[in-house]
């Protein structure tokens, strides 16, 4: 029995380098970072991928905004952009049972939680907004998307740290294969630029303390990398059953072919020294996609710009692909838009779909110093045209969570 196939027909990124498909893609082609100076107060972090031009009142009424944390705003608007890109019709007045939502976030409504805690300290319990409960819980992403657009199919928000966005795409594939729905809005959103979040990560010394130009702070695979740079934003993808997409003449960017998720069961912040679980995640995603390792044409690496992660991921990729790892491009793209935690995997899935659609490999920007432990073709600083048929995208998160998706060129 043939499997139902899932394709990407809509893309809606919201990042510090641009909102919407073409603004985002043009910023990628410009090969410049969106990371800027950021005041973290008493902490040593001085850079972030902050979205400075965000105006939620452009999209929501004042009454609606009272129920939306910043991360949920990103979720709903990115979904709107993706649905418009896919040219899918929707209506709250005519709910659809065969459209679902699969979303991811690491921290959920942490912005509103911190804001309201400070209000509580100043004004007591009566100073706290009565809508706080519906603003802070992690499931508000998919719930608000479903409410906004009338989607009554399968719906969930996962919280798998930095792998959350990739998990949302992979679970969307499963929803379609298993015939739960015909269309899924899949993505991730995060708004973590709060004192409590930055402080928590800065204290354990995982974040960059780059003292110079903040645009250069995130430098995946570079010898001088000194930690990840936190960002905010989101991305949604419309993932649709193939024949459903064809029946309405939709433009198909890419096909979602394979997915895997597992756990290290080792340490909350350090990967397994031998990379066993990340290796298995990549191999199982390839098996799910029914591909051999040598069929992969490009890997969008997790490449968080930490010393340990980038070198460990390099070793794992070489273990999975063997000699083929030296023949293909492997770039880390967080130098553009930083690391918006649970949103990142969705942003990078969107980027990979566009790479397949436009046949162009995005570069690793801010790369100046070769690291012998990261001895792959990292596409330094400048992207290139390439014949791309199959792409792998990795997300490896705190808690030892490893997720991988494989995308393919749009079927003819």
For the regions a protein language model found, what residue spans apply to each?
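ACP-dependent fatty acid/polyketide chain-elongation machinery
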Residues: 1-64, 243-255, 350-364, 408-412
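Condensing-enzyme catalytic core mediating Claisen C-C bond formation in acyl metabolism
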Residues: 5-9, 32, 36-37, 212-289, ...
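Conserved beta-ketoacyl condensing-enzyme motif
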Residues: 8, 23, 29-160, 189-198, ...
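Active-site pocket-shaping loop/turn-to-helix segments
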Residues: 13-16, 62-80, 128-137, 155-170, ...
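Active-site-proximal alpha-helical scaffold in enzymes
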Residues: 75-87, 138-142, 146-149, 154-190, ...
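Phosphate/pyrophosphate-binding loops at sites that engage ATP/ADP/AMP, CoA/4′-phosphopantetheine
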Residues: 82-96, 245-252, 282-298, 320-324
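Glycine-/small-residue-rich "gating" segment that lines the acyl/pantetheine channel
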Residues: 122-129, 170, 174, 191-247, ...
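Acyl-CoA/ACP chain-elongation machinery
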Residues: 180-226, 259-273, 303-310, 327-377
């Amino acid at each position: 029995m043939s499997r139902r196939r899932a394709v990407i027909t809509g893309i809606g990124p919201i990042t510090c380098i641009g909102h919407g498909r073409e603004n985002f893609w043009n910023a990628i082609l410009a090969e410049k970072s969106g990371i800027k100076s950021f005041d973290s107060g008493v902490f040593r972090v001085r850079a972030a991928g902050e979205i400075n031009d965000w105006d939620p009142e452009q999209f929501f009424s004042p009454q609606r905004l009272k129920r939306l944390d910043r991360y949920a705003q990103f979720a709903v608007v990115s979904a709107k952009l993706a649905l418009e890109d896919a040219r899918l019709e929707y209506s709250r007045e005519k709910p659809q049972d065969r459209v679902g939502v699969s979303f991811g976030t690491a921290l959920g409504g942490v912005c509103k939680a911190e804001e309201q805690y400070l209000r509580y300290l100043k004004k007591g319990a009566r100073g706290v907004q009565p809508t706080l409960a519906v603003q802070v819980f992690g499931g508000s992403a998919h719930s608000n998307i479903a409410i906004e657009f009338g989607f009554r199919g399968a719906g969930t928000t996962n919280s798998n740290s930095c792998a959350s966005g990739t998990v949302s795409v992979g679970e969307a594939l499963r929803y379609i294969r298993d015939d739960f729905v015909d269309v899924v809005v899949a993505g991730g959103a995060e708004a973590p630029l709060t004192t409590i979040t930055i402080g928590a990560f800065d204290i354990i010394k995982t974040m960059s303390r780059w003292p110079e130009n903040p645009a250069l702070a995130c430098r995946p695979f570079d010898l001088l990398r000194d930690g990840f740079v936190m960002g905010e934003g989101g991305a949604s993808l419309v993932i649709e059953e193939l024949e459903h997409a064809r029946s309405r003449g939709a433009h198909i960017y890419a096909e979602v072919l394979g997915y895997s998720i597992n756990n290290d069961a080792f340490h909350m912040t350090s990967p397994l020294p031998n990379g066993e679980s990340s290796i298995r995640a990549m191999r199982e995603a390839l098996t799910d996609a029914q591909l051999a390792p040598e069929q992969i044409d490009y890997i969008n690496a997790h490449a968080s710009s930490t010393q340990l992660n980038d070198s460990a991921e390099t070793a794992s990729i070489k273990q999975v692909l063997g000699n083929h790892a030296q023949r293909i491009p492997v770039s880390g793209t967080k130098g553009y838009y930083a690391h918006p935690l649970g949103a990142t995997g969705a942003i990078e899935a969107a980027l990979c779909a566009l790479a397949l659609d436009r046949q162009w490999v995005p570069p690793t920007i801010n790369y100046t110093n070769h690291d012998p432990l990261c001895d792959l073709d990292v596409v330094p600083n400048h992207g290139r045209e390439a014949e791309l048929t199959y792409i792998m995208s990795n997300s490896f998160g705190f808690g030892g969570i490893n997720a991988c998706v494989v995308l393919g060129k749009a079927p003819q």
